[in-house]
UniProtKB/Swiss-Prot annotation:
Keywords: Coiled coil. This is Putative uncharacterized protein DDB_G0289159. It comes from Dictyostelium discoideum (Social amoeba). Residues 1-68 are annotated as: Disordered. Residues 45-88 form a coiled coil. Residues 21-30, 47-61 have a biased composition (Low complexity). The keyword Coiled coil applies.
Length: 110
């Protein structure tokens, strides 16, 4: 994932507001990393037999997890480099991950 892709994805997610006790969230319209990465991968080809589809699904799920992990690593590095206070950078990162997991669970996207 290059920097342009990273910042494009980063701009789609809510971040902490100026008030440390709140986060800005748009749960109903917040994009899901899994769907974004699936779109980046070109989706799934449904013209193959069931066994091939299952193998492909497993490979794509692994690819999505790898891409998500890569995004989170880049996000953490970005926050560490651009937020003056390490505690605040950690809080922003933790809140992002919590909100993302909550969104996935609420929308049955696991």
């Amino acid at each position: 994932m290059n920097d342009e892709e990273f910042f494009s994805l980063l701009n789609q997610y809510p971040m902490r507001s100026d008030n440390p006790s709140t986060t800005t969230t748009q749960t109903s319209s917040q994009p899901n990393l899994f769907s974004i990465f699936n779109n980046m991968m070109g989706g799934m080809n449904r013209n193959q037999n069931q066994n091939q589809n299952q193998d492909q699904d497993q490979n794509q799920n692994q690819d999505k997890k790898d891409k998500e992990r890569e995004f989170l690593v880049k996000l953490k590095q970005f926050l560490d480099n651009n937020v003056n206070n390490q505690e605040e950078a950690d809080l922003i990162f933790t809140n992002f991950k919590k909100n993302h997991l909550k969104y996935i669970k609420e929308n049955n996207l696991q």
